[in-house]
Amino acid sequence: MTSRNQLVQKVLQELQEAVECEGLEGLIGASLEAKQVLSSFTLPTCREGGPGLQVLEVDSVALSLYPEDAPRNMLPLVCKGEGSLLFEAASMLLWGDAGLSLELRARTVVEMLLHRHYYLQGMIDSKVMLQAVRYSLCSEESPEMTSLPPATLEAIFDADVKASCFPSSFSNVWHLYALASVLQRNIYSIYPMRNLKIRPYFNRVIRPRRCDHVPSTLHIMWAGQPLTSHFFRHQYFAPVVGLEEVEAEGAPGVAPALPALAPLSSPAKTLELLNREPGLSYSHLCERYSVTKSTFYRWRRQSQEHRQKVAARFSAKHFLQDSFHRGGVVPLQQFLQRFPEISRSTYYAWKHELLGSGTCPALPPREVLGMEELEKLPEEQVAEEELECSALAVSSPGMVLMQRAKLYLEHCISLNTLVPYRCFKRRFPGISRSTYYNWRRKALRRNPSFKPAPALSAAGTPQLASVGEGAVIPWKSEAEEGAGNATGEDPPAPGELLPLRMPLSRWQRRLRRAARRQVLSGHLPFCRFRLRYPSLSPSAFWVWKSLARGWPRGLSKLQVPVPTLGKGGQEAEEKQEKEAGRDVTAVMAPPVGASSEDVEGGPSREGALQEGATAQGQPHSGPLLSQPVVAAAGGRDGRMLVMDMIATTKFKAQAKLFLQKRFQSKSFPSYKEFSALFPLTARSTYYMWKRALYDGLTLVDG
């Protein structure tokens, strides 16, 4: 039967042969086979009590470099072998000797090959690790190392992986990360108090990629040749063990080296004193401890920041867990507003940890109260929803809330009611804006007959305010006078005149009437017309402007005849509106259906023609209506119409040319910048031109 050592030797030999192949394909294939071989047996359980019963030797060089902020009562030991001794140090810490160093090396190579993307990009500490790799090539921070591109780092990673297949190779930072994942333990990377600019990237706790239990911690130190009092060159790794564990073993080889720890114990307690007594000053410590002033203040700053960061992280994580147990994870923006000191990567790491734990609590009372959101739904839909939610409640209570929110939005759209996001968020605060718009878009696709009907109230809405007062007053006067003349009763209540839902065509007709009345009154310039009524055609403004000269001059703007629409008059006006929509040159005559009693100031020729047409119940004929328009077009208004059309065309050409030049110079403006230069251009037009440019089209030739 093949022994464990022989299998490991065979695996390493196959990996070494695959290194000779070009690229990583052959090495990855060999690592897949090696994983199957190594998975047939697991790493032995580490023996309790630390190192075995053997003569241990304290590493004097590493001991002289042992930093003051590292864990106390620990000793770096001598480890024999070749290369950087990383795997020998880990084997010695776990099993007392370096017998399993080759197996750890093989498992680490397989881990780095099969999870290459994770260690280069997918890990939370990827940026820190890659920066440490840059600085591991030198002893000081330099611009050349800082600006190494990712492709160079990937090449260094591939070269290190290939070199790791041979026992005498040197290890780097990502070997520590991969080794932590192989051992399923944390690795405390102890870095000397040298190379201070790059030290934070190396002196840290390295956690495994995935761990199903609370991991223990191994202490491994970076050791090497001291260059000056501020610099050293890394050469190997040294295992660090606890002093009490070594004394419990009774190892005789440690006794001569124990006095060497005495001079280090006093200065090392400075940071612990600062953590216990934040108000401690430097004057109380400079006589007792050999600590410089800069080191003291750096430690005091670190201790204060440490306490603040620990408290903030604890409260932030507890808040996120509490929100998850209540039925949904708090969105990122809301979380960062509450805890700005927590990074995005930490938030997503905690979120994935909560979602991947698989431990969802029972449905809290808050979720039961969520059924009040669906109290207006039909009973059949609620029954179906209960069946779906009962199946989802077992997996995640957050899914129940999302299902209820989605059903609520779909039901509102099926009733031709569009709930704004701010109102939707009040009911379902855990749903993000993007999720809301995705659901709304899908629901609108399933309801093609949906028409966005603006809800009107007696107090008025923002839509009416944007249209102007003229959009409300003429319509209200029309309705009141029409009802009063027809029935002789009091005008109806405002609630009856303003229904909650209005068809889109009716709303557009009233908007057009309001615009026409303001143009006919002569107090609405063309620029304000374009801003107030962007959905109406500019030609309609000039047609109404020319018709304004046909009104009786004896009437003021408050004495404009208000129509009393009968059934035949309404039909005639609807046909007239449709005819004007088909032909932009058609004339929008004054309101039809006005009787001779309503207009007592001497009706004009056009008013008489309208009365004749209304009496017969038929719309106006084209030739009769075209005569005043032609006459007006030949005068001053006609010239203004032509000039305005030329100016509008030139204005659009300038806007297109501006966007095209900015697109070619790769500095495309935002809509805010564009609207400041071209305020009369609609937002949809801007995005239409932008999409055309990005699709490769040309807006302006030449």
UniProtKB/Swiss-Prot annotation:
Ranges annotated as biased composition (Basic and acidic residues): 570-582
GO biological process, one term: regulation of transcription by RNA polymerase II
Subcellular location as annotated: Nucleus
GO CC annotations on file: chromatin; nucleus
Official protein name in the record: Vertnin
Region Disordered, residue ranges: 562-625
PANTHER family in UniProt: VERTNIN
Family that this chain belongs to: Belongs to the vertnin family.
Keyword Transport: no
GO molecular function: sequence-specific DNA binding
Primary location: nucleus
Provenance organism: Homo sapiens
Cross-referenced InterPro entries: Trp_repressor/repl_initiator (IPR010921), Vertnin-like (IPR038822), VRTN_OTU_dom (IPR047273)
Protein encoded by which gene: VRTN
